[in-house]
Amino acid sequence: MAKSLSYADAGVDIDKANRLVDRIKTIVKSTPRQGVIGGIGGFGGLFSLNTEQYERPVLVSSTDGVGTKLRVAIMMDKHDTIGIDLVAMSVNDILVQGAKPLFFLDYLSMGKLNENTAADIIEGVAEGCRQANCALIGGETAEMPGMYEDGDYDLAGFAVGIADNFKIVDGSDVGQGNVLLGIASTGLHSNGYSLARKVFFDHLGLKVDSYVEDLGMTVGEAMLEPTKIYAEIVRNLIRDIHVNGMAHITGGGIIDNLPRTIPQSCKAIIREGSWEYPAIFPFMKKAGDIDEMEMMRTFNNGIGLVAVIPEPQVQEALELMQAMGEKAYVIGEIAARGENDDRIEWK
């Protein structure tokens, strides 16, 4: 008589998944926030929205992943920071619209569930939530045999925040004479990794544990540097400075992202050489013989967030960033745009 088949025979271990949920419950407790109702394990995450401090509350949401930075984490077998990247990619997108992060959910899919790897990933997600001051209220971990190679996985994140309708930062107030304040990134963040991997691993033939003198660390360490979460920076900026627009510099670089917060009637003039480039960018540019505009449209090149502010408040903003221990630079200004002008002009 043929053996009776089980879900485990098909490659899905429900008991292992349940053990992971128990571990995650402990991790989630480290991300408390007013408004969270209950814990995880239910059919949905519950959040009680207190709107008393808002005249016209608006929920702001975003979803994103980490891209092929995951491949570097897998190559290094180091998974405890990739969750920070996941939170950063979605949270930074709602921060630049003036929203205060409320809660976050994650989706993790693996070919074969590895409890320790999954727990490390969720620990990173929780750390990202703590940095962003938002609650991790739920998620999904899917074991999907036949969909991924052994050891491979994918991540997606979902952030929800709140803003007052009349305080939403949408770029509508951006105008001629405004100044571009660039706030430093920590490195690659989570974009451009397909090209970065091409340079380091294919073109140069390096390994994740190869030490590079110009970088002062191994390739893997430089590439896995977590994405900066700008929650505290943005909170202080919009409290003290009249911020007319903000852009999270991700895929597409300054070229594609800054115009998203600038009216069609305006252009941004970027002053080349006005900020400090982390070592990884000039190294890749030289090693891969990458064109300057290709660099600018692929990577953040050292600027992870741009705030558009009134010229009279520039010094105050720079002093605020310095007091927070953050690197910030005046990288350009806003000017009137002619009929045939590009949205971005480099000088």
Curated annotation (Swiss-Prot):
InterPro entries according to UniProt: PurM-like_C_dom, PurM-like_C_sf, PurM-like_N, PurM-like_N_sf, PurM_cligase
Annotated GO biological process: 'de novo' IMP biosynthetic process; adenine biosynthetic process
Pathway in which this enzyme or protein is active: Purine metabolism; IMP biosynthesis via de novo pathway; 5-amino-1-(5-phospho-D-ribosyl)imidazole from N(2)-formyl-N(1)-(5-phospho-D-ribosyl)glycinamide: step 2/2
Coarse class of the protein's main subcellular location: cytoplasm
Keywords, sorted A to Z: ATP-binding, Cytoplasm, Ligase, Nucleotide-binding, Purine biosynthesis
Chemical reaction(s) catalysed: 2-formamido-N(1)-(5-O-phospho-beta-D-ribosyl)acetamidine + ATP = 5-amino-1-(5-phospho-beta-D-ribosyl)imidazole + ADP + phosphate + H(+)
One GO MF term: phosphoribosylformylglycinamidine cyclo-ligase activity
Top-level taxon: Bacteria
Gene Ontology cellular-component annotations: cytosol
EC assignment: 6.3.3.1
Cellular location(s): Cytoplasm
SUPFAM superfamilies named in the record: PurM C-terminal domain-like (SSF56042), PurM N-terminal domain-like (SSF55326)
Family of this protein: Belongs to the AIR synthase family.
The protein, known as: Phosphoribosylformylglycinamidine cyclo-ligase
Source species of the chain: Desulfatibacillum aliphaticivorans
Lineage of producing organism: Bacteria, Pseudomonadati, Thermodesulfobacteriota, Desulfobacteria, Desulfobacterales
